[in-house]
Amino acid sequence: MKTNLPLIKLGLASAVAIAAMGMTGCGGSSDKDSTAGGDAGGGITECISNCTASGFALPENAIYVAADAAEGSDIKDAIITALTDTPDNAVIVLPKGSFVVSSSIAVTDAEGITITGYGIDATKLDFSTAPEDDGFKFAGGNDLTIRDLGVYEAKKNAIKADGVNGIHMAYTAAVWEKDLELGGDENGAYGLYPVSSQNVLMENNYSKGSADAGIYVGQSNNIVVRNNTAEHNVAGIEIENSNNADVYNNIAFDNSAGILSFDLPGLPQAYGGGVRIFNNNTYDNNTTNVGAGAVALAPSGTGILIFATSDVEIYNNTISGNVTGGVEIASYFLADADVPNYGTNYGATMVNGWSPLIKNINIHDNTFSDNSLLSPPKTGLLEAIIQGYQFGFNHTGAQQVAPAIIYGGIGELLSNAGQLEAFNGIVGDEAKANGVNYNAYGAKDAICVSDNINKNTDADLNVGKVYGTNPFDAANWNETQTAPEASLRIDLMENNTLLDCTLERLAPAVVTIKGTVYGCSGDDAELAACKL
């Protein structure tokens, strides 16, 4: 397995600049020195003077905070003063250098403001002496931007935006320098964290050392996550219970899991969908998972994980060196197999449309190399499954590795057998109108794997299905035909018979901030990745 990690030795500005280089073509390059990229975006203009490192022009009426502050001094009070009664659309400029911020910075119901430093490496804010809270915390408001700065050692989340319509994070770092440790309390939770928001644009950012997700968007709608780098977090980039999200041209490496799309029960926005994950480079995500809660379920050694969500398209990614699996697709039954008690345990959220099932997952035109190589696996969640595969032999008679793409299949089997039909009585009218159901899977509900590229150096590229999905096949049930039984099916990726099908392409996400449309339907419309 290759061990070179070229970004580790680079500064943050260099890492983000690399993420803005082009990686085009079907599947891109499997060379780990090749990185995801695309149009830099984020308001870069022809800036001659008075600019940030990213090229953002500072206006004449900008509000300068602690411009003469000494290196290492505490600028908390100056920031709070500048953010008190701030006029709409103000640009607030934090000083160049490294400074202490000894309390959380709260911004409530602001309109159109921009908080900027002088660059992702040029303005560094140390929150290590602040109380147990977020670094920056935006609550409500419209069309807000934070950019060109780094938040270090926040006790909770580095930057949180809750209930904002139009949130733009660009050229921003969220960093915890300490290595991740089980039971450790020195690494914060989320790095960059928009939640319950609309029109979310995350670009050219960097996150390292988060004990949960480095770049996370949850319970939000209309999202673009592009040109970011996530390194050495539990989850690199995560989309959770969110609708209409495009995740492209990102780099995720040395996390426990690179890129994730989840729907979790019990959240105010019950479910998401319409998530496209494309033209990313997710590699060597083998860090031990020390997370708590739902993120602890993510198997260490995972390139991309799709968990209990539907309507996801994964294409043109380079996925390599992830020792448990390249792409893993699992229903919530993997985490909780107590199907008879789902109505009792999850009924309140199932009314609103949350479902343990996964449907309409389209995996195509990705390049895979050197995934699924670990024995034994690094996580208990898939341990029995991975070891079960490793006891078998591939078509050449050699002991096989676990498949690069693994699909659980148990939810589809139970649906096709009619054993989940009673759950239809729980689903509320709005969710039913949006297609949430527990009927047998139709063609549009399928999990499809097609046209992927094998760059493995010394092993077959395999696809696996843990449970067969035909309810009339006795091999999918135990001896008394009363409960599902894992059959651990495996086939070569090319012309596979397990998941070989095609689905309709998903529509691009549309993000609008201050009247400008971002993403593949807007400023990136001519980008090669958006034409794939």
Predicted regions located by residue number:
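Right-handed parallel beta-helix/beta-solenoid
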Residues: 37-81
